[in-house]
Amino acid sequence: MLTLDTLNVMLAVSEEGLIEEMIIALLASPQLAVFFEKFPRLKAAITDDVPRWREALRSRLKDARVPPELTEEVMCYQQSQLLSTPQFIVQLPQILDLLHRLNSPWAEQARQLVDANSTITSALHTLFLQRWRLSLIVQATTLNQQLLEEEREQLLSEVQERMTLSGQLEPILADNNTAAGRLWDMSAGQLKRGDYQLIVKYGEFLNEQPELKRLAEQLGRSREAKSIPRNDAQMETFRTMVREPATVPEQVDGLQQSDDILRLLPPELATLGITELEYEFYRRLVEKQLLTYRLHGESWREKVIERPVVHKDYDEQPRGPFIVCVDASGSMGGFNEQCAKAFCLALMRIALAENRRCYIMLFSTEIVRYELSGPQGIEQAIRFLSQQFRGGTDLASCFRAIMERLQSREWFDADAVVISDFIAQRLPDDVTSKVKELQRVHQHRFHAVAMSAHGKPGIMRIFDHIWRFDTGMRSRLLRRWRR
């Protein structure tokens, strides 16, 4: 069967122009205009998706089949082009009957053209074929437009669903244009409104816990650029004012023991007029034990020093992926569970904004893994947030899973984050020594996010940095009161 792409080539129908018109009309639709105004960050992400739409439309037109009636009419037209005028005159009745049987738009006009001329000349033969071709072009264009209209409705429905999803999650997960673009890519999955409302719920909870949000941001920025001195920096003269004690007294600063007669306290001076205490006065004068006023003054002077014009270089520290281990034991249930999930959502936001990876591992009696920054990141995040924390704590298995992941090439610069209350058994010696080796040899960093003030110090001593967020009732009330 004839394909629409072949028909377009035969009749020189420009499908590219039709596709461009359809895309322009789609982008100018009122739904997208309102959405772009409300979420400007997502406008660039949707615009970047236009080449994919264009390619999908081309593929749809290329694979579309031409209806049998139109196919038969096109084949008849091609055969008629090969006929000479005498042959065409002989075949004309059959051609007219075929057009009538196929309900061709050209059938009625063709019969009128033949009836209006008593003699079929070469010029009439050419005119007949030209008008027939125009009729076929109109039919092919109409077929293209019908297919594109169907695709436009389907594409608009898909875009509206993704816009609804992205619009709901943009305030929670998109911190910049990079994050907005990745969020739009993730929205291509089959998600229902009830599913992603779970992310909205934890996003609202995170906004209610600004201290937890700041903690995640501090952890995300923990690899800032470090300044290091330059050895080849040029020197310049730098003048500064320094303050020094002055010899001229300006104000009373206190009391002291001295032999300064001019600054004697009145009680000391009174002892000089008492005969019995006169010798005591002279003794204390010689020993500088008289109570006197202490006066103090200060002055400023200019100090000239030399220093480098540019005295520092910046050693940019790489920001690698996050490997986050979350304790899913029973002791982490309730408010701890909410905080742990919201903290992971905050790390996902940072990962999307900085084009990093965010890998979550839930550890209890077994380990469950989620990739929150991949193409299916939203679905993975929903599955993670749907998990319930119950069971025991196997911290050693968590560390072994982290170390196994860190040994792969794609995770060589990752930061490991463990979220727990750290109320668990001590780590085996082999695990501790392996962690220290990774810290020393490969500069891997291990962060602890402590959800309790009662974590075991012996376990937490292994971490490079401990981020504390006490979820006890007293700490929660204090945080609420400070707000």
From Swiss-Prot:
Gene Ontology cellular component list: cytosol
CDD domains from the UniProt entry: VWA_YIEM_type
Domain of life: Bacteria
Principal subcellular localization: cytoplasm
Keywords: Chaperone, Cytoplasm
Keyword Chaperone appears in the UniProt entry: yes
Subcellular localization: Cytoplasm
Alphabetized InterPro entries for the sequence: Uncharacterised_CoxE, Uncharacterised_ViaA, VWF_A, vWFA_dom_sf
Record flagged with keyword Chaperone: yes
SUPFAM superfamilies: vWA-like
Pfam families the record matches: VWA_CoxE (PF05762)
Assembly information from the UniProt record: Homodimer. Interacts with RavA.
Sequence similarity: Belongs to the ViaA family.
Function according to Swiss-Prot or TrEMBL: Component of the RavA-ViaA chaperone complex, which may act on the membrane to optimize the function of some of the respiratory chains. ViaA stimulates the ATPase activity of RavA.
Protein name (Swiss-Prot/TrEMBL): Regulatory protein ViaA
Organism annotation: Shigella boydii serotype 18 (strain CDC 3083-94 / BS512)
Name of the coding gene: viaA
